Curated annotation (Swiss-Prot):
This is 4-hydroxy-3-methylbut-2-enyl diphosphate reductase. The active site is at E126 (proton donor). Catalyzes the conversion of 1-hydroxy-2-methyl-2-(E)-butenyl 4-diphosphate (HMBPP) into a mixture of isopentenyl diphosphate (IPP) and dimethylallyl diphosphate (DMAPP). Acts in the terminal step of the DOXP/MEP pathway for isoprenoid precursor biosynthesis. It catalyses: isopentenyl diphosphate + 2 oxidized [2Fe-2S]-[ferredoxin] + H2O = (2E)-4-hydroxy-3-methylbut-2-enyl diphosphate + 2 reduced [2Fe-2S]-[ferredoxin] + 2 H(+); dimethylallyl diphosphate + 2 oxidized [2Fe-2S]-[ferredoxin] + H2O = (2E)-4-hydroxy-3-methylbut-2-enyl diphosphate + 2 reduced [2Fe-2S]-[ferredoxin] + 2 H(+). Dimethylallyl diphosphate binds at H41, H74, H124, S225, S226, N227, S269. Its EC number is 1.17.7.4. HAMAP family: IspH. One of its GO terms (molecular function) is metal ion binding. The keyword Iron applies. Binds 1 [4Fe-4S] cluster per subunit. The gene is ispH. Keywords: 4Fe-4S, Iron, Iron-sulfur, Isoprene biosynthesis, Metal-binding, Oxidoreductase. It comes from Francisella tularensis subsp. holarctica (strain LVS). Pfam families: LYTB.
Length: 318
């Protein structure tokens, strides 16, 4: 059996920035270092940081006053920011800059008393943070996951309406919902460029290009990773067996029975070393050759948070 490796795959610029932020903060600050929510949705990465002394918490209420705290890549609501300020925390914000961009759009809608429609998955931390940017008493923010949800909405002022999306959704599915929004509300405003992040788009594009060449897909990523699940879905929608794994021990020989080509990709929060471990495990259970599948080359970089750059002396605080 042959293995085809999707390109690009694995860590995106936002995840790299978030993980590097935690590792650098561990170097410049005294322990313990607290992180609100899993810094990225990958069990291997989180477990590794725990071993280095990071304490993960669900809410800033669990963090002692004046302690060091990091916000995860998914972003937080205004209420969480205010709670952190009251506790006088030494705060490092590892929110992905692309999520921050979505936050700005929602805050602008709120400031203009525009109603806002957010396309996203209920309960996802990014969605909670984005919903929490809206403060207008005259308007409201609504969460929808499908065109069916859209049909149930009652909008008070269609001429003062804005939409935004979670950054890690399916590009194809979201495009359909956005088009339905524009058809129903012709005057709706939204971001100049789609909120779906470049890395999510690129990884989905790479999978689509590879589908006609494979008969099974293994996606390296954790079960709670939204973008990893979307990669798996692209294959299953085409009738191709697909599996989501974040531990080499989870690889099952039966997956590859009577298969000729296995595609391997990784969600934006999965490190390359884990990809290589899983490829090695696949090779153990069935003889394989490994080939890189040509794709988009990513060269995006997001700088570290300003406070951290100041502490380590690699940049100026503006």
């Amino acid at each position: 059996m042959k293995i085809l490796l999707a390109n690009p795959r694995g860590f995106c610029a936002g995840v790299s920035r978030a993980v590097e932020t935690v590792e650098k903060v561990l170097e410049v600050e005294k322990s313990p270092v607290y992180v609100r929510h899993e810094v990225v949705h990958n069990k291997v990465v989180v477990d590794s940081l725990k071993k280095k002394g990071v304490v993960f918490v669900k809410e800033v209420d669990e963090v002692p006053d004046d302690a060091v705290c990091i916000f995860s890549a998914h972003g937080v609501s205004l209420k969480v920011e205010e709670a952190a300020a009251k506790k006088n925390l030494v705060l490092y914000d590892a929110t992905c800059p692309l999520v921050t961009k979505v936050h700005r759009g929602v805050r602008l809608a709120s400031n203009n008393d525009a109603e806002c429609i957010l396309i996203g998955h209920k309960g996802h931390p990014e969605v909670q943070g984005t919903m929490g940017q809206y403060r207008s008493k005259k308007g409201a923010i609504y969460l929808i996951e499908s065109e069916e949800d859209l049909n149930k909405l009652t909008i008070k002022d269609p001429d003062n309406l804005y939409y935004a999306t979670q950054t890690t959704l399916s590009v194809d599915e979201t495009h359909g919902i956005i088009q339905a929004l524009k058809d129903k509300y012709p005057n709706i405003k939204g971001p100049k460029k789609e909120d779906i992040c470049y890395a999510t788009q690129n990884r989905q594009t790479a999978i689509k290009a590879m589908l006609k060449h494979i008969d099974v897909l293994v996606v390296v990523g954790s079960q709670n990773s939204s973008n990893s699940n979307r990669l798996k879905e692209l294959a299953t929608l085409e009738g191709i067996d697909a599996y989501l794994v974040d531990n080499p021990k989870d690889v099952d020989k039966l997956w590859f029975d009577n298969k000729k080509v296995c595609g391997v990709s990784a969600g934006a929060s999965a490190p390359e070393y884990l990809v290589q471990q899983i490829i090695s495990q696949i090779s153990k259970v069935c003889s394989t050759e490994v080939e890189e599948f040509e794709g988009i080359k990513e060269e995006v970089y997001f700088p570290l948070p300003r406070l951290l750059k100041q502490k380590i002396g690699t940049g100026k605080v503006e």
